[in-house]
Every structure is written in structure tokens, then in C-alpha cells.
Design a protein with these regions (language model features):
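RNase H-like (RuvC/DEDD) metal-dependent nuclease/polynucleotide-processing core
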Residues: 1-285
Length: 285
């Protein structure tokens, strides 16, 4: 199996203008490749290549995949916001046309990768794509790393934590946030960042080792953007790999065309999400 995280350039102003990033993880949790793609067709072609001669591929796309609402926010976004997890605010009106994610789903379908709201854990020979939220995953990993995920008032701890700000701010604050995110990834059980075949050159067209980069305010915003996409792609790939392994806890909030998101969640966080889903009559599994 291969697990592909896609940091999609989906936001208004960047969709179809900026490149997206793909990060590939094997069954052991090792990052074996990454690349950059400019269009939905290119992304689907890369995914098809990564899955060739493999027993399936799971793709986690870090972008809203199902956007049924003309304006406002999706129900799953309101659930995450109540729990103080970062949520993408998406409506059809903000895109002014077909969202890039819908174009991507159509291209992935052409290469045999189907949209799902629940990829099956521990099952090979499946080719599916699911929505993930890299910012929420990063916050959950930070919570788990601190040991606070199962102790005390979870809601209070989440509200007290700052949301990751990898994209906004000056170069000093962005570089500091990126260094913190990379450190969390380095310490995440089940994820191996450094695998020997990746480069420390941020300008390399593919296979960049994010753990070897000297991230600093001396970099340009464009270079920092490139690192952000590598980090987000890694978080997306980790999310689907963690779910597939079925050991450390995960949860799907929402269902089908109404929008759903796959999150790392165990015990206390899972119970908190389930409580909010029950109150809002939002499906979860």
C-alpha cells in the first residue's frame, strides 16, 4: 500500500495558480517520496504512478472535498470549531465556480481512486481519497506529544493552545512555526521523516527531506510556502496512514456529500467529538 498526502492549493487566489504538494508514505510509516504538481490532472497522474504495482493507495487531501453549502460554513466545520480545532471555512460562493477539489476528484476517479468518507483500516487492495485537515492533525499531535490528550479538561486545553500559523505572519514568525511543526513530526510515533533517499535542497523539484532543511527568516516567503506545503502534505499522508494502521485512534466526522473529515482522535478527544456530533445530529464513525 501507498499513502499519499496532498496539500492542495485550493484557496481562492491560489487555486490553479500555485502548485500543490504530494507526500508519499509506505506501510511502515517511512516517507519515500514527494513531488509538486500544477494541475488536478497532474496530481491524479502522480497518484496513479505512486500506486503502480502496489496493493492499493489511500489519498488524504488537505482541502474541502464536498462543499454542498452555497454560503456560510459546513456542519463539520462548526463541529471542529466548537472543540477548538482548526477548520476550513468553505462555501461554493467563495470559489466563484467549480472548486478545484471537485475537479481533482473527477481526475482521481479516472485513474481508479474513488472518493469515500470511510477508508477501511488494515485492508489492502483499496484505492480511495478522503478529506483531511492538516492544521487539526498538527494540533492533535501537539496535544498528544504534551501528554495532555488524556488528562484533565480536554476542551480547556485545546482552547488554550494556539492554532498553527504556518501561512500567516512575517518571516520570523512563520519560520518559528514551521520549525515547531517539523519538530512535532520528527517526534511522532509511527512516522519516519528521514529515509535516506531525500534531498536537503529546498529548490529540488521532488523528494525534499523537510527534516534536513535549515528553516529560517532568511528564506523568502516563496521558500517558506514550499516548506508549508511539504509539512501539510506530510500531515495529510500521516493522517490516512494512522487510520489505516488502526492502532493510535482516528475518527471520521460527517458523511457523504454533506462533507466529512478524517482526524486523528483517541479516547477523550474521540468522546468529545462524538458528543458534539450527537448534539448536532452529524454522523461519525
Amino acid at each position: 500500500m501507498r499513502f499519499v498526502g496532498c496539500a492542495l492549493a485550493w484557496r481562492p487566489g491560489e487555486a490553479r495558480e500555485k502548485v500543490s504538494c504530494l507526500v508519499v508514505i509506505d506501510e511502515r510509516g517511512s516517507i519515500i517520496a514527494n513531488s509538486f504538481a500544477a494541475s488536478a490532472e497532474d496530481i491524479a497522474g502522480a497518484v496513479e504512478g505512486y500506486g503502480t504495482d502496489r496493493r492499493g493507495v489511500l489519498v488524504g487531501v488537505d482541502a474541502p472535498l464536498a462543499v454542498p453549502n452555497e454560503r456560510g460554513t459546513r456542519r463539520i466545520e462548526r463541529i471542529l470549531s466548537k472543540i477548538a480545532l482548526p477548520a476550513y471555512s468553505a462555501s461554493r460562493r467563495m470559489f466563484g465556480g467549480e472548486p478545484l477539489a471537485e475537479e481533482l476528484l473527477a481526475e482521481l476517479q479516472k485513474v481508479g481512486v474513488e472518493y469515500t468518507d470511510y477508508p477501511f483500516p488494515r485492508e489492502r487492495d483499496q484505492s480511495a481519497v478522503v478529506e483531511v485537515d492538516s492544521a487539526a492533525t498538527l494540533k492533535v499531535l501537539s496535544l498528544e506529544r504534551s501528554g495532555a490528550a488524556e488528562n484533565g479538561d480536554l476542551a480547556q486545553k485545546l482552547r488554550a493552545m494556539d492554532d498553527p500559523k504556518l501561512r500567516k505572519g512575517n518571516k520570523e514568525s512563520r519560520a518559528a512555526a514551521l520549525r515547531g511543526a517539523i519538530e512535532i513530526l520528527w517526534d511522532t510515533p509511527g512516522l519516519r521523516l528521514r529515509t535516506g533517499n531525500l534531498s536537503s535542497d529546498i529548490a529540488a523539484p521532488e523528494n525534499v527531506d523537510v527534516s534536513k532543511l535549515d528553516v529560517s527568516a532568511e528564506m523568502s516567503h516563496a521558500e517558506l510556502d514550499r516548506i508549508v506545503s511539504l509539512v501539510e502534505g506530510t500531515l495529510a499522508a500521516y493522517t490516512v496512514h494512522r487510520h489505516w494502521r488502526g492502532r493510535d485512534g482516528s475518527m471520521v466526522v460527517g458523511a457523504g456529500d454533506e462533507g466529512s473529515v478524517l482526524l486523528p482522535a483517541k479516547n477523550a478527544l474521540r468522546a468529545r467529538l462524538a458528543e458534539e456530533c450527537g448534539t448536532a445530529n452529524v454522523p461519525y464513525v
